[in-house]
């Protein structure tokens, strides 16, 4: 990847690569810098990162249209909704999650309110559509149809009948996309295979870091293990020093130089971190503050230590996963760049299965948590060894690659549409080729009175997701795949609520008719935009913060309790805290980091009649996942099955024997008593406790008038992986 011709100013391959010690880019210069040992040549990279040639979407969509012709959302529509109350969910929890996670800072320094965010997202979507039709296709733009479609999308997002992914709420129509051209920021997740390591020894690692620093969750495999012997740096050449530019590309370039030294037997490299801005410096485009050079320094030290020990050995499963996990730790530590990882390994590889055994691999305690680990299960295999491990800590998960390649929906009719698929994203709701990204969008069937209204929502949801596929990325290999596949993940959430209110059979009807109409819409939209129809359209994402905003149960998951306390972690200096206290919510210092983090408690009522995870067996949860895989998801269903280790753990092997023919992927989580640990994200309470807590909440206190965006504080305890690390830039 890194050696190919540049296709975009931001692409990795625009970096100069030293052949011998000191082959520099044309305008770079050499200086002697004294180190502890001797004078080391310094590579000063001053010209490798040109800015986009056009401020409008980084020049990706062509020149900006004349002002009189540009798409503008009807001001009358915006005014109509200005004083309408957004339907945030769960007694203020949804609004706080929105303000904390997705509301951007406006030019006047104030935080967006929901109306502002919806206006920005819809405007950004139709800007992309207009420029695709006018600039790329040179076709007629029907302003009246655009007005009708944009207004429908606006209403359905405002009313939370569907929502773009958290990344879309944060980035669509923002400077991240409009000025910088970082289209990857609108895509949720990706996958990269290491099978190419013999030919390209650094590319998969660079892709994962570059994508992670844009907030894209990345899955990876260990197919490249054993493909080459780690030679170590070339000691016959002098070590040189590289001054790291204060940009995302600079961080990735530093990793490239370090890995090339050890994997390709080139000159060793030392790093100068002096250009990286100090910790706490405000990040204007991406939001948040700089982490400083600390996480990158730790990454370099940790990887160097591992690779020195691997010299002369074939690259191993452990080495590949260690490097990927350390990159994940670095990007999570990088303040606002949150991301997630999943590692895939072979079912019979004991080395892979032992990666989360910290008795066997004590050195991995500090970073092994950075990925969920899943095995590529084979239909008909013996699951007993893996299931014993699942009983202990919930891993590994299971991915049936043969089912992913052979089936769309698991309805007994293989179509082999996706034979190039090699893995999936961190939550495993998307089948993906290597270096393929995906865009997800979330609908809420239970927020619709009629099936016909739900079908109309599906049009707007698909139009948003399809629009994201129009924006090329800065990876050539990814563009080649994504232009061919146009893969979409149109998801449904609040399934437990729908079943409770209308029944499973009604859900089956909505899913089947919704799936059929989506394919009709895809044909219409693809024809209008002169692009290919999507290879697959539907998924069930695990959801998380997005479902909290809308007040929906996440994906296919049932709530932990009818009444519970939901705790959020927030920065102690967040401007939201004062208003939350004034509004009557309980706030206390975090027991782990009391000086920097506060805990806010929200009383939540999931509903008297809804069943909870305590009422539903492991077998019923698996059956619901299989039901959704049969009637809705042609990609995959992301489901975490909770189970009682004592009463149900012994049945895991038998359960997988039955459901291996009905699923593409599944993960498990041992069930522990809620409240077993202090300040857990969820804690069951009684109806009386809920009513007492809710009486203290003052509805007349506005939370959205805080004048700045609250810092996001990561929640490692989140059950489902669609949390801050996965979806927030």
UniProtKB/Swiss-Prot annotation:
It holds the Pfam family RNR-II_ins_dom. It comes from the Eukaryota. Disulfide bonds join 189-438. The active site is at residues 427, 429. Its cofactor is adenosylcob(III)alamin. SUPFAM superfamilies: PFL-like glycyl radical enzymes. It catalyses: a 2'-deoxyribonucleoside 5'-triphosphate + [thioredoxin]-disulfide + H2O = a ribonucleoside 5'-triphosphate + [thioredoxin]-dithiol. Its EC number is 1.17.4.2. GO terms for molecular function: cobalamin binding; ribonucleoside-diphosphate reductase activity, thioredoxin disulfide as acceptor; ribonucleoside-triphosphate reductase (thioredoxin) activity. InterPro entries: RdRp_reductase_class-2, RNR-II_ins_dom, RNR_alpha_hel. GO terms for biological process: DNA replication. The keyword Disulfide bond applies. Belongs to the class II ribonucleoside-triphosphate reductase family. PANTHER family: RIBONUCLEOSIDE-DIPHOSPHATE REDUCTASE (PTHR43371:SF1), VITAMIN B12-DEPENDENT RIBONUCLEOTIDE REDUCTASE (PTHR43371). Monomer. This is Adenosylcobalamin-dependent ribonucleoside-triphosphate reductase. It comes from Euglena gracilis. The lineage of its organism: Eukaryota, Discoba, Euglenozoa, Euglenida, Spirocuta. The gene is rnr.
